[in-house]
């Protein structure tokens, strides 16, 4: 029994690992280092392009629940994330290079996985998992359009935030701390008063953008929206978004600033930080000019500027079932962001489910029933829900899971009970999943 997995991103790596752990031989096809997408900078697998954060690790948050489900079920991605973790308050953030290197090492040394480098331009025979990502190469994308139909693919634009060197941040004008003093002081907080913010906002909303080929319709995913696009929605929009000061008290004044830019550690050494929520596609000189208007970043050394790229995803409700299999050809499955799940953890979760269920099918076992009460199951049921009329990428959230059958006072308490319900189900199927 052999399965070909196309793409060694988070979804493809997780899928290949789950298959291999269950005795299935895997041929993992990866076009790097022969060819790279515009968003990739290394030859490692599971490269994190937009951010080094896997978001909240709290069970009162849906993505925190999804991570806990995957941890309990033996996820490679969550295991490697835990081993390369950097402090980020209540979030799970990783040293992105250490994380990708560790995933690559685990995959390359697994006896059941054979890595074949080079671009894939056609769908091979036999069992196939397409996890080529939202930046699928043109040749493979053309082949998929032929296979699935011209109207099978949709798209949006995604952006990444800049990185700065820690030593170039003026700590006389910033302080270390986490929101509400929760956890350890892992963020560098760069405050602005109203006058400074207004000047910054005016410069940001009038700065020159880079040309992005085919960007005429300007579809952007809300969760990764360029900061300049968000700023144009209104003068104080950013103050209720990535620059919100709530829970951050400037130790120099004892008060909440008008706006705060947060920098999050990007590597284990703490020498590189990313600007949280500052995905952008401004021209590079404009990024330097505008972002240096943030007082603490007046002399910032930019190690990488923000970039923007086009993401492609499938019209999944029409094409895929709840196990991410192609309805018209069940030998072909899809995993990752191209299925319409949005986010690193969600991509890994789809790869996990495809790997587990494909291995069970090849071994003559029935599928594991991950119900909608679980985050893993809810994602698969969302992307295959044919009643969705205008399908768009979706982060995991409690809204796509069934409500509790009783009232609970307070959102955090309600979410905690939703998570407890889910994890009880996960424990009940864990032995079956791990078989």
Each model region followed by its residue ranges:
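N-terminal Rossmann-like dinucleotide/flavin-binding domain of flavoprotein oxidoreductases
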Residues: 65-69, 73-113
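C-terminal auxiliary extensions adjacent to catalytic cores
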Residues: 394-435
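A glycine-rich dinucleotide-binding beta-alpha-beta segment and adjacent secondary-structure elements
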Residues: 275-341, 348-350, 368-385, 391-395, ...
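N-terminal FAD cofactor-binding segment of flavoenzymes
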Residues: 17-78, 372-383
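Predominantly flavin-linked oxidoreductase catalytic cores and closely associated redox partners
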Residues: 106-284, 288-289
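Internal hydrophobic alpha-helix adjacent to the cofactor/substrate pocket in enzyme cavities
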Residues: 347-368
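Beta1/beta-strand and adjacent pyrophosphate-binding region of the FAD-binding site
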Residues: 1-11
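A short alpha-helix-loop-beta-strand transition element characteristic
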Residues: 59-63, 67, 75-88, 148-157, ...
């Amino acid at each position: 029994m052999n399965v070909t997995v196309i793409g060694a991103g988070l979804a493809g790596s997780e899928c290949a690992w789950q298959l291999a752990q269950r005795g299935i031989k895997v041929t993992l096809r990866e076009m790097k280092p022969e060819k790279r997408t515009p968003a990739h900078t290394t030859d490692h697998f599971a490269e994190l392009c937009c951010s080094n954060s896997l978001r909240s690790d709290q069970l009162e948050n849906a993505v925190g629940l999804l991570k806990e489900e995957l941890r309990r079920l033996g996820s490679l991605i969550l295991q490697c994330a835990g081993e390369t973790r950097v402090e980020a308050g209540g979030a799970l953030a990783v040293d992105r290079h250490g994380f990708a290197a560790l995933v690559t090492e685990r995959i390359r040394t697994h006896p059941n996985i054979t890595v074949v480098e080079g671009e894939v331009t056609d769908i091979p025979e036999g069992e196939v998992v397409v996890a080529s990502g939202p930046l699928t190469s043109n040749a493979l994308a053309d082949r998929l359009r032929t296979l699935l139909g011209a109207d099978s693919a949709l798209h949006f634009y995604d952006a990444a935030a800049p990185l700065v060197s820690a030593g170039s941040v003026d700590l006389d004008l910033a302080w270390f701390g986490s929101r509400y003093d929760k956890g350890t002081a892992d963020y560098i907080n760069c405050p602005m008063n109203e006058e400074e913010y207004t000047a910054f906002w005016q410069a940001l909303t009038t700065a020159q953008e880079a040309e992005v080929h085919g960007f005429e319709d300007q579809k952007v995913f809300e969760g990764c929206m360029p900061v300049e696009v968000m700023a144009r929605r209104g003068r104080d929009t950013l103050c209720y978004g990535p620059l919100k000061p709530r829970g951050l008290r400037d130790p120099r004044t004892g008060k909440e600033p008008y706006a705060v830019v947060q920098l999050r550690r990007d590597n284990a050494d703490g020498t590189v930080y990313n600007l949280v929520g500052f995905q952008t596609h401004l021209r590079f000189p404009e990024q330097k000019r505008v972002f240096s208007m943030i007082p603490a970043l007046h002399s910032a050394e930019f190690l990488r500027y923000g970039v923007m790229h086009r993401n492609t995803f499938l019209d999944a409700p029409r094409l895929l079932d709840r196990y991410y299999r192609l309805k018209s050809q069940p030998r072909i499955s899809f995993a990752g962001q191209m299925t319409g799940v949005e986010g690193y953890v969600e991509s890994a979760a789809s790869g996990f489910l495809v790997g587990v269920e494909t291995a069970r099918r090849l071994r003559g076992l029935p599928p594991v029933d991950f119900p909608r009460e679980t985050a893993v199951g809810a994602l698969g049921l969302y992307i295959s829900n044919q009643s969705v009329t205008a399908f768009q990428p979706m982060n995991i959230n409690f809204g796509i899971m069934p409500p509790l059958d009783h009232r609970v006072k307070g959102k955090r308490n309600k979410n905690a009970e939703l998570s407890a319900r889910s994890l009880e189900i996960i424990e009940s199927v864990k032995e079956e999943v791990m078989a």
